[in-house]
A protein has these predicted regions:
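Mid-domain Rossmann-like dinucleotide-binding core that forms the NAD(H)/NADP(H) cofactor-binding site
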Residues: 125-204
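Short, glycine/polar-rich helix-capping loops at beta-to-alpha or helix-loop-helix junctions
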Residues: 98-99, 183-190, 252-255
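Residue-level marker of beta-strand positions
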Residues: 85-86, 102, 152, 243
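C-terminal substrate-binding/catalytic core of Rossmann-like NAD(P)-dependent dehydrogenases/reductases
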Residues: 257-307
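Glycine-rich cofactor phosphate-binding loops and adjacent beta1-alpha1 units
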Residues: 144-146, 198-268
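A structural motif shared across PLP-dependent enzymes of the aminotransferase-like
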Residues: 94-107
Length: 337
């Protein structure tokens, strides 16, 4: 089968940073689906792994953790899917990625694809949707419906991949007042269009910008970028006994600053369940099915930014370069081999 892989960590402008190769087709394990990959999306995790994780013993390492495709075969213990089903998923970091014609994945972290979307639009969703859902409803323990009326959520980086889904989930499914941050006029408009009640500029001190906008403090913060840079401002912005959740990778984080207000800290990493095969791993199957229903109902919309053409090394190098530049808006998708 065709695949795109790397053998050594190289700068993305090196032609060998990602290469077109041939690999044997994978074989599905008992709980696995064998998926014909139709479309993929590129995420910051792809660039981080490529830059920092050397393949073992000279083997080819395949990236890619957002896939939409069709089930070709199922393992002996599969109960949730059958051959021919259209699926979408984000896979597992401890298994090969999905930048290949065929891919195997545990059924418990796979959802039925939204009926109203094509493969490329669907491939843009899984990783960011799982991250946003788990952060909001599991880490911050926000409740659907009207139960959290009077509470508020500050989303730092509301126009990014996760922020774009999180803004929609919070504004559409909860009673929270949603305040997003974005630094450019076009991304501020994007956050407003996705449902943010208020958008502030995160290139300014956040606690001051909140006060100037008439929002003295918030009960919840979702910090999606530069948490270490913003930490003092986030502590100021949170009410006593508030909740702070983050998804990024700060080099250091002085959590003693949270003590005086008894603030709780919650880390969201969507690969925890698949990495450790937790007993509740199937929750990612359930939430992806729910996301598909919300997409088909028009409650949520996909966040495709750019379509980079067919899935090959040249186009994937272009996608990685754009992500590394920090100038990508919405998700980058590729489709077909």
């Amino acid at each position: 089968m065709k695949a795109i892989a790397y053998y050594t960590s190289l700068p993305i402008n090196d032609p060998n940073a990602l290469q077109d190769i041939e690999l044997p087709a994978p074989v599905a394990g008992p709980r696995d689906l064998l998926v014909e990959v139709k479309a993929i999306s590129v995420n910051p995790v792809d660039t981080k792994v490529r830059q920092n994780v050397a393949p073992e013993n000279g083997a080819a390492k395949v990236l890619g953790w957002d896939v939409a495709g069709v089930v070709k075969a199922v393992g002996s213990e599969v109960t949730l899917f059958k051959a021919g089903d259209k699926v979408f998923y984000a896979g597992s970091l401890v298994r090969p990625g999905g930048n290949s014609e065929l891919h195997t994945v545990d059924e418990r972290i796979v959802g039925h694809m939204p009926k109203s979307l094509g493969f490329a639009e669907a491939a843009a969703l899984p990783l960011t949707a799982i991250t946003a859902w788990e952060l909001l409803f599991e880490r911050l323990q926000v409740r659907e419906g009207k139960q959290d009326e009077g509470q508020s959520l500050l989303i730092v980086g509301a126009a990014g991949g996760v922020g774009s889904i999180l803004t929609q989930l919070a504004s559409q499914l909860t009673a929270l007042k949603v305040i997003g941050t974005a630094s450019r006029p076009e991304t501020q408009e994007w956050a407003k269009a996705l449902g943010a009640d208020l958008v502030i500029d995160h290139s300014q001190p956040l606690s001051e910008a909140l006060k100037n906008a008439g929002q003295a403090q918030v009960t919840h913060v979702a910090s999606l970028t530069q948490t270490d840079h913003h930490l003092d401002q986030l502590v100021d912005a949170l009410q006593p006994q508030g909740k702070l959740a983050l998804i990024d990778d700060p080099k250091t984080l002085d959590v003693s600053k949270l003590k005086r207000k008894s603030l709780s800290l919650h880390w969201e990493f969507m690969y925890t369940r698949s990495m450790f095969e937790t007993t509740d791993m199937i929750e990612q199957h359930n939430l992806l099915n729910r996301v598909a229903e919300l997409i088909d109902a028009g409650t949520l919309k996909t966040t495709v930014g750019e379509h980079f053409g067919v899935i090959n090394a040249t186009n994937l190098r272009r996608a990685h370069a754009l992500l590394e530049s920090g100038k990508a808006k919405g998700k980058i998708v590729l489709e077909g081999f």
